[in-house]
Amino acid sequence: MMIAERGVRASARGVLSLHHIGKTYPRVMPRSKRGVWGMFGHPGRRAVDDAHTAHGPCSGARETDAAEHSVLSDVNLSFFTGEIHALLGKNGAGKSTLAHILSGFCVPTHGQLRLDGKEQRFSVPFDALRAGIGIVHQQPVFAERATVFENVVMGSAALTGVRWVRRAQVRERIDRIIAQWRMPLKKEEYVACLSADKRFFVSLLCVLFRNPRFIILDEPRCAPAQSRAVFFSHLEEFFVRSSHAPRCGGGVIVVTHRFADALRWAQRISLIEGGKACSFLRTDLLDEYCSAHQVNECIQKVSCALMSASTVTSSAVSSFSSLSDTQSCATVPRTSSARPWVLRVESLQVSKHADVPLTDISFSVAASAIIGIVGTPEDGVHVLEDILCDMHAGASRTHCTGNILLQEHDQVWCLPLQRNTPSLLRAHGVACVPSNCIQRGASMQLTLFDLLVPYTLRTWRTRVRAQMRFVARLLAEEEIYCDPLQPACTLSGGQLQRVILARELATRPRLLILAEPAEGLDSASEQRLLARLRQVAQAGTALVLLAREQHQAQWRALCTERFLLRAGTLCAEVSGTPSPSQDSHT
């Protein structure tokens, strides 16, 4: 259901427009092979060509020279102040790349970017901030040892031209923004001590402090669903419709893969597929042309389209004739108590001197079992993740007591909490997929080849051709049809998480710790992940899933046991299939 745009816009509204924007990335040689293969050619090139021949090129991408990878192609879009514009699409469609071009983090290969009719060239994010465009990243980066106040004012002197800052006035302004938006922040808090939700608000505070005209929200997952409604209402009240924003209202660009949220909060929706803007929808005209039943039917069918593995085109979105509803995931059979346990946590405690204390955490995971632990960052779920994956530092490591036991071939190993390392976990068959895949699970400067190889084919006897076939096979299994020699930064957040999971499963672990499994995944990727985890569990691998909010019914049905982490304590345990009353609240 595509409704054409009509009416005359007010001349006072700001316009941010893209004209024939395209972005391609050159192929990069793996770091370990650049010296020799740069002269004589890469011996694994045939494996890559075979993979492309077997599975076909990336759906929707334009054909380019073999030395390039196309991410965006001929994108034409316009964004206006005084409204919320949603960029909707599946993982890898090009939404985040488009947001990075708008915010100066990425330079387009060709095309023009115009602000109020004037061509703009953003070489660095500082240029975009000066023009009034700020971005709130999905995984923001801060000065960890600085306070919230210091992170907010950092760089303000270069942006405003004022070499000195009146602390009293700046503090008053920051306090006013925090109070107005009801942010759970304190200026004196150190960023290293903040949870993922609070770090999102710090990034938003940094953008609002610079009084932007456009705010870009890249996959905003600031809080559970009930709090997201409050956040978007504040966003529309205090920024989009506010008379204090530049030119009587600001513009918001939301990058998301959730059509229900986009239809609820955005005035305009653009569908990005295969690096192209293939469809456009004005939600303010739905009430005029459609009934409530038709709108609900539109939500269901577009959600099914985004969940479908096939390419979503404008005709498919407009007709909705060949789309079907999705089926829920089947429940994994309960684990027999006779199976040996793989992981046992006994009386794990983090004292009150740490950032978030934990009290008497005890549970065990048997082979083929799936344990789900749900809790907010304030309850300590991220601290538990750091301890289990051994990524904790500082007070959490110093004040941590208890036992973490691993059973392997009838031998029990007790991991030293103060001296444990990730390499020791891997030596005992433990694989980890962290919640922050960009900073903890990957290096964005590496190629996909370098990212996938190190934990499996790492011996000097393994030839490059075999390594390249291995990488191409992993990418093909995840339905990511791209060149293994392209940089990891060209992948979307959801694609990167799928690639890291494939890398960890390639090691054939006995225990898999997966944090925030549904973070940044669209419906199709989420269904694929559910099926993959079910197969892994049936093969004998024990799984521990850590999440900060309740997932849908199929996720709860996937777990053989579920725990709730509240105030640093496992206060509840639910087993079996969820009741109908629980499903109704999802």
UniProtKB/Swiss-Prot annotation:
It is an enzyme of class 7 (translocase). GO terms for cellular component: plasma membrane. Residues 46-299, 343-586 form the ABC transporter domain. Gene3D superfamilies: P-loop containing nucleotide triphosphate hydrolases. InterPro entries: ABC_carbohydrate_import_ATPase, ABC_transporter-like_ATP-bd, ABC_transporter-like_CS, P-loop_NTPase. This is Probable riboflavin import ATP-binding protein RfuB. It is a peripheral membrane protein. The complex is probably composed of two ATP-binding proteins (RfuB), two transmembrane proteins (RfuC and RfuD) and a solute-binding protein (RfuA). Belongs to the ABC transporter superfamily. It comes from Treponema pallidum (strain Nichols).
